[in-house]
Amino acid sequence: MSVSVSVDAETNVVGLIGHPVEHSLSPAMHNAAFKELGLNYVYLAFDVPPERLEGAVRGAADLGIVGLNVTIPHKEAVMELCDELDRDAELIGAVNTVRFSRGKIEGFNTDGEGFLRALREETYFDPRGTKSVILGAGGAARAVSFKLATEGADEIVIANRTVDRAERLAEELKEKVGVKARAIGLDGDEIERELRDADLLVDATPVGMYPNEDEPPLVTADQMHEDLIVNDLVYNPPRTRLLEEAEKAGATPVSGVGMLVYQGALAFELWTGEEAPVEVMREAVLEHLR
């Protein structure tokens, strides 16, 4: 689904800054949404190397750009340029959405809320009183674990190849939110033990992401149980080998497409004040992944 965009002197500009950005699905997703609602907006992708971040952000504000999505490697560095941060951005320690408003640079993080909205939509999952096992300890794992913790999760286990990094995240979760959290390695037996009474498994690593779709998953069907929800944050491909393992186990598989769409929908609403056409955005993403 290619989207033609009409631009005039009154078109509102939003966009993405990162390095690199050429494979991003965000322009297709947002421009489809603007067209659906008849909004005079255009979404562009800007490749900004780290040494030019401050100039790009301040220049965008001066040019009257409405807002920006922020991706790797700028999510942490851009925080220093923001005049205001929302609670999620402060907790997670990263910004993925910027809004230029009233002469200020406002920073938000919609990743955690996008993750939870997608999960609730597909499974009716309620984090309260639950146990989750998170694979990975990077930016996506931080967003997911802090959102689960602030929404009432009882226990969060961070599993990472570098256990020290997982331990730092677990300590932050305990200190900032007061949730029961601990760290483990990626040893299969240890993960299997933790999954026995877990409600949710989230893979926040790039394992299985295009072009490495055939990479073996970190968890297999024999380590899962049928009451487990398995959410792979990888969205390309939409159906990963981990999700195939979940199906074999009778568990509930959840693709990463939903988180991508909902974090974008939340940014859309911050910029436009309009309710995002989520299904149009989802279809635009899936069309580009086919």
From Swiss-Prot:
Keywords: Amino-acid biosynthesis, Aromatic amino acid biosynthesis, NADP, Oxidoreductase. The active site is at K75. NADP(+) binds at G136, A137, G138, G139, A140, N160, R161, T162, V163, D164, R165, L233, G256. It catalyses: shikimate + NADP(+) = 3-dehydroshikimate + NADPH + H(+). Its EC number is 1.1.1.25. Shikimate binds at S24, L25, S26, T71, N96, D111, Y235. GO terms for biological process: amino acid biosynthetic process; aromatic amino acid family biosynthetic process; chorismate biosynthetic process; shikimate metabolic process. Pathway: Metabolic intermediate biosynthesis; chorismate biosynthesis; chorismate from D-erythrose 4-phosphate and phosphoenolpyruvate: step 4/7. It is an enzyme of class 1 (oxidoreductase). Involved in the biosynthesis of the chorismate, which leads to the biosynthesis of aromatic amino acids. Catalyzes the reversible NADPH linked reduction of 3-dehydroshikimate (DHSA) to yield shikimate (SA). Belongs to the shikimate dehydrogenase family. Homodimer. This is Shikimate dehydrogenase (NADP(+)). The gene is aroE.
